Amino acid sequence: MGVLGLSKLLYDRTPGAIKEQELKVYFGRRIAIDASMAVYQFVIAMKGFQEGQSVELTNEAGDVTSHLSGIFFRTLRMIDEGLRPIYVFDGKPPTLKASELESRRQRAEDAKHEFEKAKEEGDDEAMEKMSKRMVRVGRDQMEEVKTLLRLMGIPVVQAPSEAEAQCAELVKKNKAWAVGTEDMDALAFGSRVMLRHLTYGEAKKRPIAEYHLDEILEASGFSMQQFIDLCILLGCDYVPRISGIGPHKAWEGIKKYGSLEAFIESLDGTRYVVPEEFNYKDARNFFLEPEVTPGEEIDIQFREPDEEGLIKFLVDEKLFSKERVLKGIQRLRDALTKKTQGRLDQFFTITKPQKQVNSEASTAGTKRNRGAVALPGVLQRKSSSGHKKAVKK
């Protein structure tokens, strides 16, 4: 879920803090990408529906390969444009997220029932809609994505807990310039810059939305803690919402009362019921001090692609087209060996006018530096896989 309604609220209230960009603008930038979010996007995007059947991208053996094909081609596209993606994977979800995870499980069950109902009624449109809501990416598929990225030479980071928090930590410690995710809570975790739509395919033709935390805070007048309180009040993954509190009421409430405590105290108890499980202090502390691997302990390295390993994994095991894989490897090598100019802002200090892309944000919070494992990075591109085949659900 991220933070419910935050994106639209920021467009309404702090439009100057959001910029629409093309992919090529991020030439030379290291971007920490929420891997789970990206993989789900690829799987859903490649899921089709034909003649009453769910259709997924598969190889000749019938194995689903959309997660690998999606990561392979989108990563190649980013590398072609000069980006340097760093993929960050979720670890163990925090206890605070248990209720949200149960809600997601229930929504998936509801979608399954709606799918069967639509099937009986012959409603293909509803069946396609519900089939996308039923998409789940298993642990084995995620491990395959990690294997592919390492063989490509792309850095892989395993977060101890939430990937967005680990991505934000990499930005805070200058290991990455921005976080790439659809979940707005990357801002609540303190990322100076956040990019949405980064992993969208060309077919969607949507510009990348670039959010700047320091400009959001400046335009809103919020402190970092007040911004976190706003995110909690809007609805996040760690506490239930207070029914009846919309985005603009939440904004005005934090502006007027200065804190979540004072705002809650002001509420009319006969009109608004604060859920018993509304442990907002725990949620606030988690945003301020998430469980992450300290950024300075993570070594980000982009490496040469392992051609032999890629052929073995993608062609021999996953039955991808060898020709397409080899072309992908060559694209990657071309991008890596190409002599390119560095970004000007890496060599000169640029005086900030009113709005500056590289502005520094005050970021709150320390980390609980617990048992995280940083996986060695690798870099490279891959080619796609097989053909579309019907997979009955």
Curated annotation (Swiss-Prot):
One of its GO terms (molecular function) is 5'-flap endonuclease activity. Residues 99-120 have a biased composition (Basic and acidic residues). Its main location: nucleus. Residues 1-108 are annotated as: N-domain. The keyword Zinc does not apply. It is found in: Nucleus, Nucleolus; Nucleus, Nucleoplasm; Mitochondrion. Its cofactor is Mg(2+). Keywords: DNA damage, DNA repair, DNA replication, Endonuclease, Exonuclease, Hydrolase, Magnesium, Metal-binding, Mitochondrion, Nuclease, Nucleus, Phosphoprotein. Binds 2 magnesium ions per subunit. They probably participate in the reaction catalyzed by the enzyme. May bind an additional third magnesium ion after substrate binding. HAMAP family: Fen. This is Flap endonuclease 1. It comes from Trypanosoma brucei brucei (strain 927/4 GUTat10.1). The gene is FEN1.
